[in-house]
Amino acid sequence: MAAGSHGGYRGYEVAREREHDVGVSRRSKEHYHHRHPSRHRDSERRRDGGRSGGRELSNGYSHRRDSPRPPPRRRPSEGRTEDREPGEVSGGSGSERSGERPMKTREPRENGVTRVSKEEAKMSPSKKRKQSPVIWDRNGSQRQARDPVRGIREVDAVVAEIIMHQSHSLPVMSSLSSIGDGHSPMILDVSVDKVQEYEKNRIVDEEEEGYPTMRNILTSRWADAGDEEENVFVPKKKKSVSPVDSIERGSTKKVTSPESGEVLVYNSVRSSSRSSDSGVLQGSANRDLEVEKGDNIDVEKAADDDYPAGHLLDSDFEGEDCRSETPECTRSPRRCINMLQGCRSVDEFERLNTINEGTYGVVFRVRDKRTGEIVALKKVKMEKEREGFPLTSLREMNILLSFHHPSIVEVKEVVVGSNDRDIFMVMEYMEHDLKGVMETMKQPYSQSEVKCLMLQLLEGVKYLHDNWVLHRDLKTSNLLLNNRGELKICDFGLSRQYGSPLKPYTQLVVTLWYRAPELLLGAKDYSTAIDMWSLGCIMGELLSKGPLFNGKSEIDQLDKIFRTLGTPDENIWPGYSKLPGATVKFGKQTHNRLRDKFRAVSFTGGPMLSEAGFDLLNRLLTYDPEKRISAEDALNHEWFRELPLPRSKDFMPTFPALNEQDRRFKKHMKSPDPLEEQWMKEQGNNGDRGLFG
């Protein structure tokens, strides 16, 4: 073929003649009539400003685009074929295009890249990619088709048939011979660059608008795969593909005729599209592949920041498939994190004195060298390191680090020592515990002061129960006080979360003096009512400055309870006879003598309690757990609203903090704790214990 400005279009006509020779053309007027003719009329009105009124000129007469008609035949006077696609416009005469600005032709391609004119360079990238076919009239000038979208897709359909039906006998590059100065023909740019896009969108086109879709983040290849479902089909996901890469991708697909109406079946494209050493990708195709792989590496490097050093990510060649099929493949937790690695060292704290040593740890008063703040440092006992980290300490850390309430002690952080056996919890420092203060006082708390303390205690317990946590060891030594009148609950070593329905738990919880009768009788199905019984014992101790029930054993504890509150039966406590410990025979006590301990008016100096206060205490110490008052109902009790009103925290009595020597020699009357006794027997240590037990 002779080189010239008409070479691209004549090459297209030669291909058309070959198509008619082999009989592979399946185009029909019904196919183009079926594809939404109203869409093309809207496109024409926007392009020509409504001048043609939905009609176009072809060979001297007008017709509507949506009217089915065969392509015009070739005129004898012309030396070439003039078959026109339904989306093309033919120029009738020179006067017909006198009022229009001629369009510049696209220059040939070099290494798969099409050079464009300066006017076209000002267009957006999406418009550069989708250029309209050029139509030549008799005089050699050129005009642009009025509907480039349809024209491109119809040319793509023809060229796709030529490439696939003639590839067995005629190579693609030989059928589309070079023209001019050795550049690729213009038809290759139109066919190969768009044929794959046409195949993917042909079936969906009948339900979509015919105009290019605006690119957004949802169609981006980096869209979050976690928000996609497995069966979602995204036909609008497009990216720039070089011609040679398109041929390589097309060779790996089983493609039916674009007009046969069959669904296109795709084989695996991953290996061919991402293999850089196949020997086929050259020039700009290699550059496109390098950019694509570079993008994958950048994204996965950003995700690699969440993984520890040395963690291997998935192969770059499987990244895109993982995002579209299994979102977990890029988010699977493949790391084992030691939470103690990010903890501060205990050397950053200055030790001041030892506060106490309890059953589950030693407590020090220290100063933070970084901030100068005085905090408490509780060392976790690790004597049984063969069995792993202590479960009691693990539960306490988990609960306290997740809770934030004014009535619950705050754990600021966890620090480590020189070895793995030295682990400390950094807590806010409180000057006193309630038991030590009560033994220092000469007179018991007044009713207004008891109300202030009980309100804070009930608020903290309500917060625990609202978050499905049982403390299971509420006692005066586990309640901390400061000189601002604030009370905080501490020592969550026996606490645990509970659920609904209730599960059986161990009954060996709660210090003996504060243990509920159902636990003493061997019940394993219990709930928040055991904490409310402990609050009743604490309230009575605050009023009387001594323990309410100070038994020496479980049987003695039950006997003291029954002597004060009366012996229960099935009428008072339904299900009492079915408890394991109910077989033990106790002395029959029919009267409740609790009122004898707390008089409404005392002339002997004993504890006083109003009728409303006694009602609250009696409801806290109810035998039946189902009838025992809850923390929320207790907060709304009338006792807190009657005179005398609760005292303000600012006016609560203060006491000097005990130094280490005073704590060492001060003897406390202490409740026998079965857990502590068992711990001491296992460790062979019978020494004295402190306040934080």
UniProtKB/Swiss-Prot annotation:
GO terms for biological process: regulation of mitotic cell cycle. InterPro entries: CDK, CDK11/PITSLRE_STKc, Kinase-like_dom_sf, Prot_kinase_dom, Ser/Thr_kinase_AS. Keywords: ATP-binding, Kinase, Nucleotide-binding, Phosphoprotein, Serine/threonine-protein kinase, Transferase. The modification Phosphoserine is found at residue 500. One of its GO terms (cellular component) is nucleus. The keyword tRNA-binding does not apply. ATP binds at residues 355-363, 378. Residues 26-39 have a biased composition (Basic residues). Its EC number is 2.7.11.22, 2.7.11.23. GO terms for molecular function: ATP binding; cyclin-dependent protein serine/threonine kinase activity; protein serine kinase activity; RNA polymerase II CTD heptapeptide repeat kinase activity. The keyword Chaperone does not apply. This is Cyclin-dependent kinase G-1. It comes from Oryza sativa subsp. indica.
